[in-house]
Design a protein with these regions (language model features):
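Residues forming the flavin
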Residues: 2-6, 11-97, 138-478
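Dinucleotide-binding Rossmann-like beta1-alpha1 core, especially the glycine-rich loop
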Residues: 78-131
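A non-catalytic, amphipathic alpha-helix used as a structural packing/dimerization or gating element
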Residues: 108-111, 115-119, 136, 140, ...
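N-terminal leader/propeptide and maturation segments of large enzyme subunits in energy/redox metabolism
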Residues: 124-136, 140, 367
Length: 478
């Protein structure tokens, strides 16, 4: 069966033949290309990225404080993906950041994480690691967590920092290009070519047909929805996964000081007493700033960053509180569910992020400009719009978030203060779980799927490790 035929422009067929075509230039794609060039430099490797090269990824909002609506968004797309401007935390435990241990086994996942970490160090990552030499302090945090019915997930963290992470990925881009990797920027894959049940290549929005012996989908969180549609179109087996929906919490550094100094990122999990829903902390940014990310069609969601440089630090800590929602039949579009909640918030706030004080959140009233101005805690996201999260979230999620904040207050008092700021909506679009084997082959021969866009990983480190692993599987077949 031929699902797509060659395209033609001005009477001339535009074709290219490569050994490996990688869709997406995020951490998974980068580390896949890196490993291929290290071990098999004779291979012809092509990366296709819908965003810009890293040196051209500039967000005007950093200067103007107002989103310019760039398409594609430089925060989420381009070389290094969303990782380029993230806070750059590398989770060094297989227990955090994805499902590689389930697919490869715990020991193999541990080995790959260590190997990918060594590559980050080679390109300039900070050698210091949080959470490895504070046994007494961590025991005290664990004791408080147990008392609050919270589970502390212990995970060593290497913090790159937003600006240092950018430099590391810049070096990786230069390295790949110097090794002969071809990268097509500002290019979208529009079709996947299937002939007789085998993936043969892709077609781009520039009218080019690229044939490859191996194709890797490494589209990241930004491309998860696109890949879901392609899976349905060409018959790749998938299953509905989890969607995480919640808020970004901002407090003074003093409130989180003990956790920040000893763990940097305290990963805490709670099962709420009312609904028994799983709520977790995620992506803590000490002395960081709350930020806006933009996805397809200008959908604004909240995120957070933290910088290494002292001159860029703030006096506030922010972190995400995410409620995990697992759906059963007949519902099978969790990504759309998360998007609808974010769209509702965007509609209420004119395409910007909503902010509410925890005091108003608990009292069921909207935060006004006046109350926000006299709030003791000053927001780091300056264009956030005061509002009411109860007009956005279902009642169940509101209850889950409130109960989690009350539990966290027992571990680090001050979290449940009236002045605490809640920004919405934070959504993680890693819910399209593609069924893959240990070589990350999909049900379509010749097409492999890795990283956040395939529902395999949820963070920089496991995505990077996933890239190394799939490269080694590819080399066995070429």
């Amino acid at each position: 069966m031929l699902l797509y035929v060659n395209t033609q422009r001005n009477g001339v067929f535009m074709t290219k033949n490569v050994d490996v075509a990688i869709i997406g230039a995020g951490p998974g794609g980068i580390f896949c290309a890196y490993e291929l060039m290290e071990k098999r430099p004779e291979l012809k490797v092509l990366m296709i990225e819908k965003g810009r090269s890293i040196e051209k990824r500039n967000c005007p909002k950093r200067v103007t404080k107002t989103c310019a609506g760039c398409k594609p968004c430089s925060i989420t797309t381009g070389f290094a993906g969303a990782g380029a401007f993230s806070d750059g935390k590398l989770s060094l435990s297989p227990d955090v950041g994805g499902t590689l241990p389930d697919i490869l086994g715990y020991d193999e996942a541990t080995k790959l994480i260590h190997e990918s970490d060594e590559i980050y160090l080679k390109f300039g990552a900070d050698k210091s690691v949080y959470g490895v030499d504070k046994e007494v302090e961590i025991r005290e945090i664990r004791r408080k967590a147990i008392n609050a019915n919270l589970k502390l997930v212990e995970c060593p963290i290497r913090h790159l920092g937003t600006e240092e992470g950018y430099k590391i990925y810049s070096k990786l881009q230069e390295h790949l290009i110097s090794k002969g990797v071809e990268i097509e920027f500002n290019t979208m894959v529009t079709e996947i070519i299937i002939e007789d049940g085998i993936c043969k290549g892709v077609v781009t929005d520039k009218g080019e047909t690229i044939y490859a012996k191996e194709i890797v989908s490494a589209v990241g969180r930004e491309g998860a929805d696109w890949f879901k549609d392609k899976c349905e179109e060409i018959g790749i087996e998938t299953k509905p996964g989890t969607v995480d929906v919640g808020v970004r919490v901002e407090v003074r550094d003093e409130v989180m000081q003990f956790l920040n100094e000893n763990l940097y990122e305290a990963k805490l999990i709670y099962h709420t007493p009312t609904f028994d829903d799983k709520v977790r902390t995620f992506c803590t940014n000490p002395s960081g700033e709350v930020a806006t990310e933009y996805y397809e069609n200008g959908l604004a969601v909240v995120n957070g960053h933290a910088y290494k440089g002292k001159e860029l630090k703030t006096n506030n800590t922010n972190f995400a509180l995410l409620v995990s929602k697992n759906f059963t039949k007949p519902f099978k579009t969790p990504i759309e569910y998360g998007k609808k909640i974010a769209e509702l918030s965007n509609m209420l706030c004119g395409g910007k992020i909503l902010v509410q004080t925890y005091g108003d959140f608990r009292r069921g009233r909207r935060t006004t400009e006046e109350r926000l101005c006299r709030n003791n805690l000053i927001p780091t996201l300056k264009d956030a719009v005061p509002g009411d999260l109860s007009l956005v979230f279902p009642h169940r999620i509101m209850v889950d978030l409130d109960e989690m904040i009350q539990a966290l207050d027992k571990v680090t008092p001050g979290i449940a203060s009236d002045e605490t700021l809640l920004y919405g909506v934070e959504v993680k679009f890693y819910s399209n779980k593609v069924i893959v084997n240990k070589d990350f082959e999909t049900s379509i021969k010749g097409l492999r799927a890795i990283g956040d866009g395939a529902g395999v990983t949820r963070g920089l480190q496991q995505a990077s490790a996933n890239g190394l692993c799939v490269a080694r599987s590819i080399m066995k077949s070429l």
